[in-house]
Structure formats: C-alpha cells, structure tokens
Amino acid sequence: MNNKITINPCKNKVGAIIDADLNNADKNILSNIKEALNEYGVIFFRNQNLTTSQYIKFAKHFGKCADYPMLKSLDDYPEITVVEKKPGEKIMFGEGWHTDSTYTQSPPKITMLYSINTPTRGKGNTRFASQYLSYEKLDKNYKKKIENLKAIFSADGPISKTRNNRIAEKGKGVDPKSLLAEHSIVKINEYNGKKSIYLSPGHVTQLVGVEKK
C-alpha cells in the first residue's frame, strides 16, 4: 500500500499534478487532494489504474455524483457518461470553452475525467483556464461593476451543436431549450474565500439586465 502524495503546481498558476495511489488514498491524502483542488482549480493524476467501481468510489469522496441530463449513462453505472469521438466524426463532443452543466439549477461543484484512449497527436488535449486568475486580473472598478451581475445559462447555448451526434445516438429526449438557469457570474469558494469568474461561453446566452449590442 502506497500512502504517499506529492503535489507539483503547473506553470502559469493553472492546475497541479498529483502523484498518489487513488486506490489506497487515506483521509490525509484525500484532505490534501481536496485542498489542492480548491487552491489550483484543476488537478491531474498520473499512472492510475482504476476499475469503474473504484473510480466512482473515489468520486464520492467529494460529494454525491450528479446526473448528466442530456445523455444516457453506462447501463450499470448511472454516475458515468462516456465522452468519445468516433471514426469519421469531424465535431468534437464538448469542444469549446465551457463549464459542465451550468444550465442546471444546482451545477456540480467539480467534474472528473478518466482517460482511457487519448490520441498522441491532434485534438487530444483538454485545456483548462483559471477563473481565479481571470478575476484577480480585473481592475477594481470592473470587479465592482460585475459583483452582482447574473447570467442566463442554457443547454441550448453555442456548444450544444457539439452534442448532436451523441444525442441522436443515446440522448435522453430532453429539450435543451428547457434547461435554463440563472447564476451569479462571480463565485466565492466556500473553502478558501477566493473569488472567480463564473462564465461559460458555451452556455451563457444573456447577462441579466445587460442589453445586447
């Protein structure tokens, strides 16, 4: 059993790489992982070999698993939705800047991805941006201007077209236009008090009270 953990921040203050055995993570390791997640926003685990059940067990250390409203899950594992690009498809599922399921009334606090087959070249990379840094770099006047703004998030936003192939294949029959939610665009992390921008170009359709130009 390996109960060691190392945490190495990535460049540009976006994310951290964590080396730990997630199959044998004790309370101390889990505490360190949660602290790193709140500090860096995104964390990466290398060289893991988890069964589906072990993956779900690890996920539940962070809270109840959310249901993805648009697509059917794995038959035996309702907590898991498969993200894939099939041969011949030109559109990448979920391609474009977004935060998952922000069009729901209670969006998940985190998203977990477990890579099984990843291309060695081309569009195999998932990119991440720090919304902590986005907020920090705003000047004081702009921070004040957006402090109480809210946005409308829609499942029928710009990124919805990337789901069409999967929905045709295994959609739940939900009308994306019916999934709308209003959220503040400045969020405060309840664990450390850090503020971040909560905007999703793939899902935001309108700023409340702000006229479109």
Task: Report residues per predicted region.
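Non-heme Fe(II) oxygenase catalytic core, chiefly the N-lobe of the double-stranded beta-helix
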Residues: 2-213
